[in-house]
């Protein structure tokens, strides 16, 4: 997965993807945000898996 696909998936599910990516801290990412994980060099598919784990109510069509 590329970063652009990660951002697209986040945009598809969250009404404010920019705020979600910069403000929501994920224990699944070690206590950092999506943007910080990207900067750190985490693989986009691993970041997406963490987002899904962080949001268990996410419908299957977005997973």
What residue spans do the PLM features occupy?
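C-terminal alpha-helical interaction appendages
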Residues: 1-63
């Amino acid at each position: 997965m590329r970063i652009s696909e990660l951002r697209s998936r986040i945009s598809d599910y969250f009404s404010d993807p920019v705020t979600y990516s910069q403000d929501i801290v994920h224990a699944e990412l070690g206590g950092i945000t999506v943007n910080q994980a990207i900067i750190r060099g985490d693989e986009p598919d691993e970041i997406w898996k963490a987002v899904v784990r962080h949001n268990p109510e996410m419908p299957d069509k977005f997973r």
